[in-house]
Amino acid sequence: MSGHSKWANIKHKKAKADAQKGKIFTKLGRELIVAARAGGGDPNNNFRLKIAIDNAKSANMPNDNIQRAIQKGVGGGEGESYEELRYEGYGPGGVAIMVDIMTDNRNRTAGEVRHIFSKHGGNLGETGCVNWMFTEKGQLMILKEDLKCDEDELMLLVLEAGAEDLQQDEESFVVYTAPGDMEAVRQALLDQGIAIEEAKINQVPQNTIEIADLEQAKKLVRMMELLEDHDDSQGVYANFEFADSIDEEELD
């Protein structure tokens, strides 16, 4: 199993735990509000909103909550104005990290994110300091337990629909596309009855740094978890992988 997959497995287990606690609903709700405000309340004419609705349903967010968030976005009610920001910096071992934020108070959020970086051996940098190390990609996750065809059939389907790559970890397949091709690939999967666990625009590192020191790896995992747990965080991206010598169980 690759080092990147070790972190992917940790993230996936944590995401399921967060969904069970309902913790994820706040973040999904913000994305619904912002997507509806930016592009209108009709998902057929607003792809960002369509993806936000799909992800909310995958997390078992009640439909009433989904519709309420969309109406807040369309109606532009007071107290629901969020600013989208991206913070960039470095973590332990010189790992490049980006954090996408939705906040109603950028000064508060900046201070809290800076504190997480500095407390765990990193430092927050200037805008643009690391984003050149990443490429924007569409990403579609399919759980292996939900897949009704074999890997070769899935590979053929997504490549014919315009995907660039298909990767896998312990529990899922991940399809990568150019951002503009994600909708076509998503629709091709749905047309074949293949359930999509999550769809998003991701920032994929062009190259990765291998982390071989266990203590440094633990510090990095803790930092990433705190950034992802932050109430205003909508996405965290980094360019590391763990060496084969590091056991995933040691990082939990």
UniProtKB/Swiss-Prot annotation:
GO molecular function list: DNA binding
Keyword Protease: no
Gene3D superfamilies the record matches: 1.10.10.200, 3.30.70.980
Keyword flag Transcription regulation: yes
Key words of the record: Cytoplasm, DNA-binding, Transcription, Transcription regulation
GO terms, biological process: regulation of DNA-templated transcription
Pfam families, per the entry: TACO1_YebC_N, Transcrip_reg
NCBIfam families associated with the record: PRK00110.1, PRK12378.1, YebC/PmpR family DNA-binding transcriptional regulator
Family: Belongs to the TACO1 family.
Record-given protein name: Probable transcriptional regulatory protein DSY2470
Species annotation: Desulfitobacterium hafniense (strain Y51)
